[in-house]
Amino acid sequence: MSSFSQHPDPDHVVVHLSDTHLLAGGHQLYGVIDSDAPLRRLMERLVASGQNIEALVFTGDLADQAEIGAYERLRDLVEPWAAKLDAQVVWVMGNHDEREPFSTVMMREEASQEPQDRVYMAGGLRII
């Protein structure tokens, strides 16, 4: 990456995405907004950029109505692109997200009402 200012080239590249608000079953947000297509286009652009992206950080609201199918949809859309980028995926809940479906689908753990706090390591960078 070339520098266009006084700042040095970055040691780490982290992509932060927020408020995907996906719905289950291919439904559109408010009946008109396709939440998948822009996310898919963004993932394509990230891969095409050639950047060494160490982490994709997704902060809530991941699912608009905390539906299991919405979490599955997001995970299934993002994880193949993350694998192409060799990037760690970091999932963080928002106020629309609920602990049980989040822990089951996004973290691949048993359903839990416990806080979903995590520490991730990505290329020597600790993400809390």
Q: Where is each model-derived feature located?
A:
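N-terminal active-site segment of His-dependent metallophosphoesterases
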Residues: M1-E72
